[in-house]
């Protein structure tokens, strides 16, 4: 698997000759201004919930690439209404086998509404299993005991966890989440994009490295 980080909560994973893109928010992210969204590849776009900083570039990328949008029912219906019929709806606890592997939609503790105020259903995360490895994307969430179920059922290669605090887990809770899912290869997400989620990267890195192994993704260009 090849992991590419685009900033905020957006990253992609190449697995089984497919590119899985998560929560695309690039054009509105000042920290990602060097990235040309027209070059971002996707065969599938996974949306954890409806907030603008997770869906902003999804429609643009889906129209250009023909990618399938995977999310909860309410979010996929919203994209259908935006003229994007190529979607796959999941709901909590449900899974589906795609051409690259199996995806399960799991619980997240957060809120969700679409940019126009439409109800976004319940937020979630994704557990993806493939022949090349397994990983968990938490989406925006608080620390939750449900994460222990992931560790009991799936041997993870890495976990992508929010660490920015204020709106989601902070560093300490993310480290506890890593313990819950029994994975210590961690990709930290959802930090430094806005003032409320600013953290001190050097001290945060030291804290994470002292208790887990931080995953170093390929830098997006």
Predicted regions and their residues:
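Short active-site oxyanion
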Residues: 1-2, 63-68, 133-135
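Active-site HxH/HxHxD metal-binding segment of metal-dependent hydrolases
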Residues: 33-112
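Pre-active-site segment of Zn-dependent metallo-hydrolases
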Residues: 12-51, 56-63, 111-117, 141-153
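Active-site-proximal loop/helix segments of hydrolase catalytic cores
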Residues: 114-179
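Active-site neighborhood of phospho(di)ester-bond hydrolases with catalytic His/Asp-centered motifs
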Residues: 21-23, 42-50, 70-73, 136-141, ...
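Active-site environment of divalent metal-dependent phosphoester hydrolases
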Residues: 28-29, 51-56, 76-79, 94-97, ...
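Zn-dependent metallo-beta-lactamase
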Residues: 1-19, 26-30, 97, 104, ...
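Binuclear metal-ion centers of metallo-dependent hydrolases, dominated by the metallo-beta-lactamase
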Residues: 68, 80-94, 175, 179-221
């Amino acid at each position: 698997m090849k992991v590419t980080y685009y900033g905020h909560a957006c990253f992609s994973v190449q697995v089984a000759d497919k590119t899985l893109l998560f929560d695309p928010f690039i054009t509105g992210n000042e920290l990602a201004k060097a990235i040309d969204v027209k070059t971002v590849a996707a065969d599938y776009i996974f949306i954890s919930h409806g907030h603008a900083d997770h869906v902003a570039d999804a429609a643009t990328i889906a129209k250009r690439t023909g990618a399938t949008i995977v999310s909860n029912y309410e979010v996929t219906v919203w994209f259908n209404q935006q003229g994007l019929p190529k979607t796959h709806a999941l709901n909590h606890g449900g899974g589906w086998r795609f051409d690259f592997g199996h995806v399960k939609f799991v619980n997240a503790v957060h809120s969700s509404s679409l940019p126009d105020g439409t109800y976004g259903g319940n937020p979630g995360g994704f557990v993806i299993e493939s022949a090349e490895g397994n990983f968990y994307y938490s989406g925006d969430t608080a620390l939750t005991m449900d994460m222990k179920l992931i560790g009991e059922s799936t041997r993870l290669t890495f976990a992508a966890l929010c660490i920015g605090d204020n709106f989601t887990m902070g560093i300490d809770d993310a480290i506890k989440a890593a313990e819950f899912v029994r994975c210590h290869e961690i990709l930290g997400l959802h930090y430094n994009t806005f003032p409320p989620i600013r953290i001190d990267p050097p001290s945060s890195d030291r804290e994470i490295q002292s208790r887990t192994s931080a995953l170093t993704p390929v830098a997006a260009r």
